[in-house]
Amino acid sequence: MKKIIPLLLISFLFFSCSDNGFNNNNPYIPNYSFSVTLNLSFASYSNLNFVSNAIYYAGPEVGPKGIYVFNTGSGYNAFDAACPNQALSSCSTLTLDGINVVCPCDDEEYSLFTGQGKLQYPLKQYRVEKNGNILRIYN
């Protein structure tokens, strides 16, 4: 009995660990390893200083379709700009529509607050860290 209790406690601790719900599995969007820094003091990124504003960033290091970065008011979200439920094609770059992005291939709308849409896959999300006026977006 004395050996069972520590074993149960260790098992409980092991199964209570989580990955913070960060799931980026998507068969349509390849995994790219990248790290980008954006200076919010620069005019091209200054919209991110205001709640519910987004910018599109299409540097070569972030993959074929770029990323959207969004100020939620309590932090920042970054999502791949490729339609999450379409194979990469000429119509699969999301377009900005207020606090949402829309896939031109199927007119599906996704929230920049949550990344959710109505189809199977949500937007592919990337990690964001803020240090002063610098945002680091990476995966």
PLM region spans:
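C-terminal motif of bacterial Sec signal peptides marking the signal peptidase cleavage site
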Residues: 12-16
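Short cysteine/histidine-rich metal-coordination sites, predominantly Zn2+-binding motifs
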Residues: 97-107, 117-128
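N-terminal pre-ligand scaffold of iron-sulfur
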Residues: 20-98, 109-112, 127-139
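Sec-dependent signal peptide recognition
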Residues: 2-7
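Short hydrophobic/aromatic-rich motifs at helix boundaries and adjacent loops
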Residues: 1, 17-19
